Amino acid sequence: GFKDWMKKAGSWLKKKGPALIKAAMQE
């Protein structure tokens, strides 16, 4: 359900978030 999706999104952001922020700042 929605909570499972939120858990997946949260863990994905923890992995990908820093890299995405770095990429955004470099532009």
Curated annotation (Swiss-Prot):
Keywords: Antibiotic, Antimicrobial, Secreted. It is found in: Secreted. The keyword ATP-binding does not apply. GO terms for biological process: defense response to bacterium. GO terms for cellular component: extracellular region. Belongs to the ponericin-G family. This is U1-poneritoxin-Na3a. The lineage of its organism: Eukaryota, Metazoa, Ecdysozoa, Arthropoda, Hexapoda.
